[in-house]
Amino acid sequence: MTRTASSFIQKNMVADTFSCSHQSVTVRRICLAALLLFALLPARAQMWDSLATSDYHIDTAMVRVLRVEVDNLTFFRDNEYSSQMTKGYSLPGLWIEPRLAYTPIRQIDLEVGLHASLFHGANKYPNYVYHDIGRWKGSQYQRGAHVLPWVRARAEFKHLTVVLGNIYGGQNHQLIEPLFNAETNLSQDPEAGMQLLWDRKHLHADTWLNWQSYIFEEDSHQEAFTVGSSWKVLPGNQEKPLRWHIPVQLVIQHRGGEQDTTSMGVQTIMNASAGAGLTWTPRNRKVLTSVNAEANAMVAYQQSGSIWPFDGGAAYHVGAGVTLWQRLLLRGGYFNAPKHFVSLYGNHFFSTLSVRNGQSYDGIGTAYAHVEYSHVFARRYVLGAEGEFFQSNMTGHSETNFSFGVYLRVNPSIIIKRWK
């Protein structure tokens, strides 16, 4: 496989840059993971939604109010991988977004600021997009932190919200687990472009364009952008204890551009999925808060280019979870790709193409278990921890891997001036 193909499937730049050699899994490390996971105070489950999503509706109480918003996520994550699919590595660091925000009228909101990523022990950072974009500018560096400008404009209608600039990305898209690795919330650059968010009683739709790499005349790298659409159909009465939903999702990445002087040509690859899910919420929630299950079918397709050594493939995924005491989430599932499949932004254990050695396996089956626990101090202040275990089986090879992480989100809002 070419170096281009290998760099493409490396979803997370930081994982490659700060990768470390894997050490054998020991009882001490497993005990440390368990201690960090369960030594937290009671709270509620759905940790990543609390840690990495934001409300995109305009707060009408903030009309004609100038304020400072600070969003911060501090994290320590350790991926103890002894895998043919990917490398083991740790992510110790934080990102912070200080922003100046103003809402001139009820339908318009403006924000401007900076996004800075910092990894403990690093003092200079390569200047390229931190999310699966090749090493085009690896000789250019920033010192101290990886810093980007941050600008967002929102316009809100009755059922539609239009976002330009830095969009509500990452966890906000609510992509299914095999198509999106939640770890990406820690290390990716803020998504930027445009977004349409549509809300009706029986439908939530998120359609976006994330422009990842811009090129100038006769530039030496490719233009790159991702287009996505995530629909959640909500049939029936969603107030009932037992309710169901239909997720339909599409993610396309395109590389090329008429100004491109490279010889790589146009490259377009995609993932698509459709499925169905059930959620049951008992009336007495003292212990059992909710039970959910979901099944999805997925396809991967290479419309043009040669990033993948195959043109397409299919996979399926089933998963179930239970929330206890409104604070503890236990989840498990199984992913299977009978022949070929690559997840553009998912975990490497949900792909048949190895990022470690470039090998393409004829099929993969991954069973996994996930436990998470979080403490919500207030709406904008969340402490969480999680542990994940993966059992993957490929042709002639099987492996067990685990990871754990601890995260703290702090998101204060400070009013500077209010006009009547």
Predicted regions, residues:
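Transmembrane beta-strand segments of Gram-negative outer membrane beta-barrel proteins
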Residues: 54-79, 110, 293
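Surface-exposed strand-loop-strand hairpins of Gram-negative outer-membrane beta-barrel proteins
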Residues: 73-95, 125-126
